[in-house]
Curated annotation (Swiss-Prot):
Recorded family membership: Belongs to the bacterial ribosomal protein bL28 family.
InterPro entries listed in its UniProt record: Bacterial_rp_bL28, Ribosomal_bL28, Ribosomal_bL28/bL31-like_sf, Ribosomal_bL28_bact-type, Ribosomal_bL28_sf
Alphabetic keyword roster: Ribonucleoprotein, Ribosomal protein
Any one of the GO BP annotations: translation
Record-linked PANTHER family: 50S RIBOSOMAL PROTEIN L28 (PTHR39080), LARGE RIBOSOMAL SUBUNIT PROTEIN BL28A (PTHR39080:SF1)
Gene3D superfamilies in the cross-refs: Ribosomal protein L28/L24
Superkingdom as given in the UniProt entry: Bacteria
GO MF, any single term: structural constituent of ribosome
Gene assigned in the entry: rpmB
Name under which the protein is recorded: Large ribosomal subunit protein bL28
UniProt keyword annotation of rRNA-binding present: no
GO cellular component: ribonucleoprotein complex; ribosome
């Protein structure tokens, strides 16, 4: 599944996790992406959208 929102272009972010003893390990944070049917130019199309865009109403769901 895609790791990038097609609406806001939010994607994976890389960083470092620290343990209690301050040892580092590289890791990634991925956005919560859902595959939904949405209206794109008046036609229903399957798009990959983050949950923040779904909740804020930036996407009109196709029923």
């Amino acid at each position: 599944m895609a790791r990038r929102c097609e609406i806001c272009d939010k994607g994976v972010v890389a960083g470092v996790s620290y343990s209690h003893s301050h040892r580092q390990s590289k890791r990634t944070w991925a956005p919560n992406i859902k595959k939904v049917k949405a209206l794109v130019n008046g036609t229903p199309k399957t798009v990959h959208v983050c949950t923040r865009c779904l909740r804020s109403g930036k996407v009109q769901r196709a029923i």
